[in-house]
Amino acid sequence: SPERINPGDKKNNLNQINKILAYEGESQKVKTLLKNVYKKICKKLIFSKNIKEAETAKGIENIQRDLNIALFNEILIICNRLNLDFNEVIRLASTKWNFINFSPGLVGGHCLPVDPYYLTYIAKKKGYKSKVTLSGRYVNNYMKKYVIDFANFYLRKSQIKKNKIKICIVGLTYKYGVSDITNSQKIEIFKHFKKKFKQTKCYDPFLKSADNLKFNELKKYNFFIFLSKGKKFSNIANLVDKKKII
């Protein structure tokens, strides 16, 4: 039974999603047993007689999302190089009826940074080397370096002395709304700036950390690097000078 719930998503919870249940062979008894257990917690059950096919389906669900995010990450990079407004480009593209909009970002968590490698590894053993799937992984893994380089360029441009720079990293968990830091590239970004600038702290109400600031302490900081987007972070933009936001 591949896991399908989306942490932090209150709408698509275990009760609401289509639940895939896989079993081998023709045993009606096994199917009935699975049905009797899962119907108590899931509204819709989808059955498969092949466990490998069910697990592959789970893999491509994550690969598809990983690739979509990678595409928008790459578009963001290109727009920045061409001095174009990424948000305006996407707004215009979104007026086409079949355009699918995604947000660029730092991919983390238990699934997206990991699952693509399971399928590409097996495919390689069978004689096929993945091109598209691994390209998406390359782009999404690169985003950590891209964010660090972009922020460092901005900080150098400010011409503020190193010992006067006080950085607040906004959002450290792998996605907004969860307390999980599994495979979070944001942690690595935070470590980079913490090592380089001693006066570096974070603000993430979903995370318990000694470096976590309280909301009323934010005014003391002169640079803010936003790594997550969400309701609890939107007030910061109103609190501080927009020139301080990276």
Which positions does each model-derived feature cover?
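Structural/interface elements that position substrates and couple domains in central-metabolism enzymes
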Residues: 1-246
